Regions:
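ABC ATPase NBD coupling module
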Residues: 19-22, 78-95, 113, 121, ...
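Conserved ABC transporter NBD signature motif
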Residues: 37, 69-80
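Conserved ABC ATPase signature
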Residues: 153-157, 161
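A short, proline-enriched helix->beta-strand linker immediately N-terminal to the Walker B motif
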Residues: 172-176
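A short, surface-exposed alpha-helical micro-motif characterized by mixed small hydrophobic
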Residues: 220-222
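ABC ATPase "signature
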Residues: 235-239
Length: 303
Protein backbone atom coordinates (compact mmCIF):
# COMPACT_ATOMS: atom_id res chain seq x y z
CA UNK A 1 0.00 0.00 0.00
CA UNK A 2 1.48 3.35 -1.07
CA UNK A 3 1.59 6.21 1.42
CA UNK A 4 0.31 9.64 0.44
CA UNK A 5 1.24 11.44 3.67
CA UNK A 6 3.38 10.15 6.51
CA UNK A 7 3.68 12.14 9.75
CA UNK A 8 6.38 10.55 11.91
CA UNK A 9 6.95 11.51 15.56
CA UNK A 10 6.53 15.20 14.81
CA UNK A 11 7.01 17.82 17.53
CA UNK A 12 7.05 21.61 17.43
CA UNK A 13 8.30 23.96 20.13
CA UNK A 14 7.99 27.73 20.18
CA UNK A 15 10.05 30.03 22.39
CA UNK A 16 7.85 32.70 23.94
CA UNK A 17 8.50 35.82 26.00
CA UNK A 18 11.45 38.15 26.40
CA UNK A 19 14.99 37.62 27.59
CA UNK A 20 14.06 37.44 31.29
CA UNK A 21 10.78 35.58 30.91
CA UNK A 22 11.54 33.16 28.11
CA UNK A 23 9.66 29.88 28.07
CA UNK A 24 9.21 27.01 25.65
CA UNK A 25 5.72 26.05 24.49
CA UNK A 26 5.24 22.50 23.22
CA UNK A 27 2.67 23.14 20.50
CA UNK A 28 2.80 19.60 19.05
CA UNK A 29 4.30 16.59 20.79
CA UNK A 30 5.26 13.34 19.04
CA UNK A 31 2.38 13.22 16.54
CA UNK A 32 2.25 10.30 14.10
CA UNK A 33 -0.29 9.20 11.49
CA UNK A 34 -0.42 8.41 7.77
CA UNK A 35 -2.76 8.59 4.79
CA UNK A 36 -2.81 6.04 1.99
CA UNK A 37 -2.98 6.69 -1.75
CA UNK A 38 -5.30 3.70 -2.18
CA UNK A 39 -8.51 5.04 -0.65
CA UNK A 40 -9.38 8.76 -0.47
CA UNK A 41 -10.51 9.73 3.01
CA UNK A 42 -11.41 12.64 5.23
CA UNK A 43 -8.98 12.53 8.15
CA UNK A 44 -10.07 14.89 10.90
CA UNK A 45 -8.00 16.63 13.56
CA UNK A 46 -10.18 17.62 16.51
CA UNK A 47 -9.25 19.81 19.45
CA UNK A 48 -10.04 23.00 21.28
CA UNK A 49 -8.06 26.22 20.82
CA UNK A 50 -4.44 25.65 21.80
CA UNK A 51 -4.54 21.91 21.14
CA UNK A 52 -1.94 22.15 18.37
CA UNK A 53 -4.18 21.22 15.45
CA UNK A 54 -3.47 24.35 13.38
CA UNK A 55 0.28 24.14 14.06
CA UNK A 56 0.21 20.53 12.87
CA UNK A 57 -1.65 21.62 9.73
CA UNK A 58 0.90 24.36 9.03
CA UNK A 59 3.72 21.82 9.25
CA UNK A 60 1.92 19.51 6.83
CA UNK A 61 1.61 22.47 4.43
CA UNK A 62 5.31 23.27 4.82
CA UNK A 63 4.56 26.66 6.41
CA UNK A 64 6.31 25.62 9.64
CA UNK A 65 9.26 23.27 10.07
CA UNK A 66 9.03 20.57 12.77
CA UNK A 67 11.41 20.91 15.71
CA UNK A 68 11.83 17.14 15.48
CA UNK A 69 10.35 14.27 13.53
CA UNK A 70 9.59 14.08 9.83
CA UNK A 71 6.67 14.73 7.48
CA UNK A 72 6.79 13.03 4.09
CA UNK A 73 4.50 13.47 1.11
CA UNK A 74 4.78 10.62 -1.38
CA UNK A 75 8.10 9.62 0.14
CA UNK A 76 9.72 13.06 0.11
CA UNK A 77 10.26 15.20 3.19
CA UNK A 78 8.09 18.31 3.31
CA UNK A 79 10.39 21.32 3.63
CA UNK A 80 10.11 25.07 3.28
CA UNK A 81 13.78 25.09 2.24
CA UNK A 82 13.45 23.22 -1.06
CA UNK A 83 14.06 24.75 -4.47
CA UNK A 84 11.39 26.93 -6.04
CA UNK A 85 10.50 24.13 -8.47
CA UNK A 86 10.18 21.62 -5.61
CA UNK A 87 8.00 23.98 -3.58
CA UNK A 88 5.75 24.66 -6.58
CA UNK A 89 5.36 20.94 -7.24
CA UNK A 90 4.46 20.34 -3.59
CA UNK A 91 1.97 23.22 -3.57
CA UNK A 92 0.30 21.72 -6.62
CA UNK A 93 -0.22 18.47 -4.73
CA UNK A 94 -1.18 19.79 -1.28
CA UNK A 95 -3.52 22.78 -1.24
CA UNK A 96 -4.86 24.72 1.77
CA UNK A 97 -8.37 25.94 2.49
CA UNK A 98 -8.24 28.53 5.26
CA UNK A 99 -10.71 29.46 7.96
CA UNK A 100 -11.76 32.93 6.82
CA UNK A 101 -12.46 33.24 3.09
CA UNK A 102 -12.51 37.05 3.35
CA UNK A 103 -8.88 36.99 4.50
CA UNK A 104 -7.88 34.58 1.73
CA UNK A 105 -8.65 37.15 -0.98
CA UNK A 106 -7.39 40.70 -1.46
CA UNK A 107 -10.54 42.88 -1.26
CA UNK A 108 -9.21 45.04 -4.12
CA UNK A 109 -8.63 42.12 -6.51
CA UNK A 110 -11.35 40.41 -8.52
CA UNK A 111 -12.04 36.75 -7.76
CA UNK A 112 -11.48 35.65 -11.35
CA UNK A 113 -8.05 37.29 -11.32
CA UNK A 114 -7.06 35.08 -8.40
CA UNK A 115 -8.32 32.01 -10.20
CA UNK A 116 -6.54 33.03 -13.39
CA UNK A 117 -3.18 33.51 -11.68
CA UNK A 118 -3.49 30.07 -10.06
CA UNK A 119 -4.39 28.53 -13.43
CA UNK A 120 -1.42 30.13 -15.17
CA UNK A 121 0.97 29.20 -12.37
CA UNK A 122 0.10 25.54 -11.98
CA UNK A 123 -1.42 24.48 -15.31
CA UNK A 124 0.90 26.63 -17.45
CA UNK A 125 -1.99 27.68 -19.70
CA UNK A 126 -1.65 30.79 -21.85
CA UNK A 127 -4.67 30.81 -24.18
CA UNK A 128 -7.72 32.73 -22.98
CA UNK A 129 -10.22 29.99 -23.82
CA UNK A 130 -8.10 27.34 -22.09
CA UNK A 131 -7.72 29.46 -18.95
CA UNK A 132 -11.43 30.27 -18.80
CA UNK A 133 -12.27 26.61 -19.34
CA UNK A 134 -10.02 25.47 -16.50
CA UNK A 135 -11.43 28.11 -14.14
CA UNK A 136 -15.01 27.21 -15.02
CA UNK A 137 -14.30 23.50 -14.56
CA UNK A 138 -12.96 24.10 -11.04
CA UNK A 139 -15.89 26.37 -10.17
CA UNK A 140 -18.42 23.83 -11.47
CA UNK A 141 -16.97 21.29 -9.03
CA UNK A 142 -18.04 23.52 -6.11
CA UNK A 143 -21.44 24.52 -7.48
CA UNK A 144 -20.42 27.84 -9.05
CA UNK A 145 -19.56 28.99 -12.56
CA UNK A 146 -17.18 31.46 -14.13
CA UNK A 147 -20.15 33.58 -15.21
CA UNK A 148 -21.18 33.95 -11.54
CA UNK A 149 -17.80 35.15 -10.27
CA UNK A 150 -16.29 36.98 -13.24
CA UNK A 151 -15.73 40.65 -12.52
CA UNK A 152 -16.85 40.34 -8.89
CA UNK A 153 -14.87 41.39 -5.83
CA UNK A 154 -14.84 39.46 -2.52
CA UNK A 155 -17.28 41.85 -0.79
CA UNK A 156 -19.83 41.19 -3.54
CA UNK A 157 -20.12 37.52 -2.58
CA UNK A 158 -21.53 35.81 0.50
CA UNK A 159 -19.24 33.98 2.90
CA UNK A 160 -20.45 30.64 1.59
CA UNK A 161 -19.89 31.62 -2.05
CA UNK A 162 -16.45 32.98 -1.25
CA UNK A 163 -15.41 29.83 0.59
CA UNK A 164 -16.58 27.80 -2.41
CA UNK A 165 -14.47 30.03 -4.66
CA UNK A 166 -11.49 29.46 -2.34
CA UNK A 167 -12.00 25.70 -2.60
CA UNK A 168 -12.31 26.00 -6.40
CA UNK A 169 -9.00 27.84 -6.47
CA UNK A 170 -7.42 25.03 -4.42
CA UNK A 171 -8.78 22.44 -6.88
CA UNK A 172 -7.29 24.04 -10.00
CA UNK A 173 -3.95 22.12 -9.74
CA UNK A 174 -5.94 18.86 -9.22
CA UNK A 175 -4.30 18.11 -5.85
CA UNK A 176 -4.69 14.68 -4.24
CA UNK A 177 -4.73 16.32 -0.77
CA UNK A 178 -6.50 19.34 0.71
CA UNK A 179 -5.78 20.70 4.18
CA UNK A 180 -8.94 22.47 5.36
CA UNK A 181 -8.45 24.46 8.57
CA UNK A 182 -11.83 25.21 10.20
CA UNK A 183 -13.38 25.82 6.74
CA UNK A 184 -16.93 26.34 8.03
CA UNK A 185 -16.35 28.28 11.25
CA UNK A 186 -16.63 31.71 9.56
CA UNK A 187 -19.58 30.75 7.35
CA UNK A 188 -23.20 31.42 8.33
CA UNK A 189 -24.79 28.47 10.13
CA UNK A 190 -27.35 28.04 7.34
CA UNK A 191 -24.55 27.51 4.80
CA UNK A 192 -22.19 25.32 6.81
CA UNK A 193 -23.66 22.01 5.74
CA UNK A 194 -23.36 22.98 2.09
CA UNK A 195 -19.59 23.38 2.54
CA UNK A 196 -19.37 20.16 4.57
CA UNK A 197 -21.31 18.27 1.88
CA UNK A 198 -19.00 19.78 -0.72
CA UNK A 199 -15.95 18.36 1.08
CA UNK A 200 -17.70 15.00 1.19
CA UNK A 201 -18.35 15.08 -2.55
CA UNK A 202 -14.71 15.99 -3.25
CA UNK A 203 -13.71 12.77 -1.51
CA UNK A 204 -16.46 10.57 -2.96
CA UNK A 205 -16.67 11.92 -6.51
CA UNK A 206 -13.20 13.33 -7.23
CA UNK A 207 -11.02 11.07 -5.07
CA UNK A 208 -9.48 13.94 -3.07
CA UNK A 209 -8.23 13.16 0.44
CA UNK A 210 -8.88 15.91 2.97
CA UNK A 211 -7.34 16.74 6.32
CA UNK A 212 -10.25 18.44 8.07
CA UNK A 213 -9.38 20.54 11.12
CA UNK A 214 -12.23 21.41 13.44
CA UNK A 215 -13.53 21.69 16.98
CA UNK A 216 -17.04 20.76 15.79
CA UNK A 217 -17.81 17.16 16.72
CA UNK A 218 -21.07 17.09 14.75
CA UNK A 219 -19.49 17.81 11.36
CA UNK A 220 -16.54 15.57 12.22
CA UNK A 221 -18.94 12.69 12.92
CA UNK A 222 -20.80 13.36 9.68
CA UNK A 223 -17.93 13.40 7.19
CA UNK A 224 -14.85 11.77 8.76
CA UNK A 225 -13.42 8.36 7.99
CA UNK A 226 -10.77 8.54 10.72
CA UNK A 227 -9.83 11.15 13.26
CA UNK A 228 -7.39 12.14 15.93
CA UNK A 229 -8.26 14.08 19.07
CA UNK A 230 -5.53 16.42 20.33
CA UNK A 231 -5.05 17.87 23.81
CA UNK A 232 -2.27 20.38 24.45
CA UNK A 233 -0.20 19.15 21.52
CA UNK A 234 -0.62 15.41 22.10
CA UNK A 235 -2.79 12.91 20.27
CA UNK A 236 -4.94 11.32 22.97
CA UNK A 237 -7.16 9.17 20.78
CA UNK A 238 -7.10 8.06 17.14
CA UNK A 239 -9.23 5.71 15.09
CA UNK A 240 -12.43 5.21 13.13
CA UNK A 241 -14.50 8.37 13.52
CA UNK A 242 -17.78 6.69 14.40
CA UNK A 243 -16.16 4.29 16.86
CA UNK A 244 -14.27 7.05 18.68
CA UNK A 245 -17.13 9.56 18.84
CA UNK A 246 -19.81 6.99 19.68
CA UNK A 247 -17.74 5.62 22.56
CA UNK A 248 -14.76 7.87 23.42
CA UNK A 249 -12.33 6.28 25.86
CA UNK A 250 -9.79 8.94 26.83
CA UNK A 251 -11.06 11.34 29.57
CA UNK A 252 -10.46 14.38 27.34
CA UNK A 253 -12.33 12.75 24.45
CA UNK A 254 -15.24 12.00 26.78
CA UNK A 255 -15.11 15.58 28.03
CA UNK A 256 -15.33 16.98 24.50
CA UNK A 257 -18.37 14.86 23.76
CA UNK A 258 -19.99 15.65 27.10
CA UNK A 259 -19.46 19.39 26.65
CA UNK A 260 -21.86 19.42 23.70
CA UNK A 261 -25.17 20.79 24.90
CA UNK A 262 -27.49 17.90 25.67
CA UNK A 263 -31.13 17.88 24.59
CA UNK A 264 -32.22 17.56 28.22
CA UNK A 265 -30.25 20.61 29.37
CA UNK A 266 -30.60 22.75 26.24
CA UNK A 267 -33.56 24.70 27.59
CA UNK A 268 -31.62 25.67 30.73
CA UNK A 269 -28.41 26.48 28.87
CA UNK A 270 -26.48 23.90 30.90
CA UNK A 271 -23.54 21.83 29.77
CA UNK A 272 -23.63 18.12 30.45
CA UNK A 273 -20.12 18.18 31.93
CA UNK A 274 -19.00 16.27 35.00
CA UNK A 275 -16.60 18.41 37.14
CA UNK A 276 -14.65 15.28 38.07
CA UNK A 277 -14.12 14.53 34.38
CA UNK A 278 -12.85 18.07 33.82
CA UNK A 279 -10.34 17.71 36.67
CA UNK A 280 -9.12 14.32 35.46
CA UNK A 281 -8.63 15.54 31.88
CA UNK A 282 -6.75 18.60 33.16
CA UNK A 283 -4.52 16.57 35.48
CA UNK A 284 -3.48 14.24 32.65
CA UNK A 285 -2.11 17.10 30.53
CA UNK A 286 1.22 17.10 32.39
CA UNK A 287 1.66 13.33 32.01
CA UNK A 288 3.05 12.09 28.67
CA UNK A 289 1.60 8.59 28.67
CA UNK A 290 1.77 6.25 25.67
CA UNK A 291 -0.64 5.36 22.87
CA UNK A 292 -2.05 1.87 23.32
CA UNK A 293 -4.00 -0.07 20.69
CA UNK A 294 -7.51 -1.39 21.25
CA UNK A 295 -9.41 -4.26 19.68
CA UNK A 296 -11.41 -1.96 17.40
CA UNK A 297 -8.22 -0.55 15.90
CA UNK A 298 -8.16 2.73 17.77
CA UNK A 299 -5.20 4.12 19.71
CA UNK A 300 -5.79 5.61 23.17
CA UNK A 301 -3.28 7.43 25.34
CA UNK A 302 -2.85 5.63 28.66
CA UNK A 303 -0.90 6.65 31.77
Amino acid sequence: MSTLLDVRNVSKQFTMGGLLSRRVVNAVQDASFSLSTETPEIFTIIGESGSGKTTLARMILGLELPSSGDIQFRGKTVSAKGSRAEQLAFMGNVQPVFQNPFEAFNPLKRIDRYLESTTRRFLKLTQRDDIDGAMDEALQKVGLSLAEVKGRYPHEMSGGQLQRAAIARALIPNPPLLVADEPVSMVDASLRMSIVNLLKSLRDDLGVSIIYITHDLATAYYISNRLIIMQRGRIVEMGDARAVLDNPEHPYSRLLKASVLSTEDAGDGKLATDPAMVKLASDLVARPGTLESRGDGRLVRVY
